[in-house]
Amino acid sequence: MGGFKAESVDQAALASWWTVLNDPTLNQLVEQSLANNTTVKQAMARVTEARARRGIAGASFWPSINASTSGNRSSSDSVLTSDGQIVTGSREIYQAGLDASWEIDLFGGTRRAYESSTAQLGATEADLRDVLVTLLGDVALAYIDVRTTQSRLTFAERNLESQREVVDITGWRAEAGLATSLDVEQAKSSYSQTLAAVPQLESALEAAKNRLAVLTGQTPGSLEGVLGERKPIPVAPAEVIASVPAEVLRRRPDIRAAERRLAAQTAEVGVATAQLYPSLSLSGSIGVNATRTSDLISDGLHSNRYGISLSMPIFRAGALLQNIRVQNALVESAFATYEGTVLSAYEEVENALTSWANEQKRHAALVDSVESARIASELALMQYNSGLVDFQVVLTADRQLISTEDALAVSDGELTSNLIRLYKAFGGGWSVFPPAITQAAAP
C-alpha cells in the first residue's frame, strides 16, 4: 500500500466514493442498502410529511370556500279559516349555498409561515441526504469489518498449522530425548491459546455479517451466500483526498440541514411580528331557499351576503411581544447550532485526515515488522532443531509473529476504514438518489 499521494477532492468521485475500492460485492451491498434500508424509508416518509405541511401553509394564500345544504320541517296547531277550512301548520324549507372567506396577508404573516415550512422541508430533505451519507459509510465500514475479520481468521488458521507442526516436532524430539516434556507442554499451550482466539473471531465475523444484513434491509444470516467466501480487504487507492474546498464541505447534509432550520426559525420571527398588526378578512355567501327541493334550482328565493372585517390586538398583556422575544431567542439558538455543526464538520475532516495519515505510517512499520517476525520465527525453529537455542526462543518468536500478523490484518482494514471515514466526513454520497428516493424527493 505504499506510494500514496494526496489530491484535492473531485465532486464526481465524492458522489460515488465507494467505487474507488473497486469491489463488486461492496457495490452490490450499497445498492441493496439504498433500496431496502429502513432508516432511509423513515427519512423518506418525513420528507413526504414536510412537503405536505408546506402544502398546508401554502393553502393559506387562497380563499376558503365551503358548500352547505339543509332541510327543515316545522309544524304548529291546525287553524280554522274564515271559510271553514282547516289548515295544518306544517312547513318545509330547504336551503343550499356557498360560503367563502379570505384573510388578506397584509403584513406578511402568511408569507413568513410559508417560508418557514419551505425551509423546514429543505432541512428534512437534507436530513434524508445525511441518512444516506451515514448509511453508505456504515455499510462500507461493516463490509471492511467482515473482510478484516476473515483476514485475521486466515492468519490465525495458518499459524495454527505452523504451531501444530511445532507440537509434533517437540513431541518427536522428546521421544528421542532431545527435548523435555516442558517443551512439549509449552508448544501445546501456545497452540491452544491461538485456537482459543478463533471462536472470538468467528463471533465477530457473524456480528459484522448480521450488521450488514440489517443495513441492507435483510434478516440476519441472509448474506452468507454473498459474504461466505473469504476475499481480500479492499485496498485504498494510491491517490487519496487530502483537501476539500470550503464550499464543498458546506454542502454536507448536516450543515445544510442546520442552515435550513436557521432559515425556518428566522421566518418564524416574521410570523410572530405580523401578529402585532391588524388582520383583514373578506367574507361572502350566496344561497337559495325553497319549500321544495325541486325549486332550489329553478324557483328558489336567492340571497347573498358580503362583508369585510378588520381585527387588531389591543391588549394581550405583552404576550405577543414576548412571543417575538421567544422566536428571536430560538434564532440565536439555531445560529449557534449551525456554527457548532460547521466546526464539528471541520473537526471531523481534520481528525479523519490525521487518522488516515498516521495509520499509513503504522501500516508501513507493521509490514516491515511482519517480515522480520517471519524470518525470526523460521530462524528460531531451525536453531532449536539444531540444538543452538532453547524452546523459549521459539515460543517468543512464534508469539511475536502471531501478534504482528494480526496487527497487520487489523491495520489493512483500518487503513481502508479511515479512508471511508474521510469520505464520510466530506459528506460523500449525499447526492446519491436511487429511483425510490428520487420519487420521494420530487415536488
Q: Each predicted region: which residue ranges?
A:
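Terminal intrinsically disordered/low-complexity segments used for targeting and assembly
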Residues: 1-35, 94, 118, 202-250, ...
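Short flexible linkers and secondary-structure junctions
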Residues: 1-138, 280-284, 303, 314-324
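Transmembrane beta-barrel architecture of outer-membrane proteins
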Residues: 26-28, 93-95, 141, 186, ...
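Sec/SRP-type N-terminal targeting helices
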Residues: 41-42, 58-59, 104-132, 182, ...
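Outer-membrane beta-barrel proteins
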Residues: 76-80, 181, 291-295
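Periplasmic alpha-helical coiled-coil/stalk elements that build and connect Gram-negative outer-membrane
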Residues: 110, 126-244, 355, 359, ...
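A short glycine-centered flexible hinge/capping loop motif at secondary-structure junctions
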Residues: 174-178, 384-388, 425, 429
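C-terminal structured "cap/appendage" subdomains that terminate the fold
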Residues: 377-416
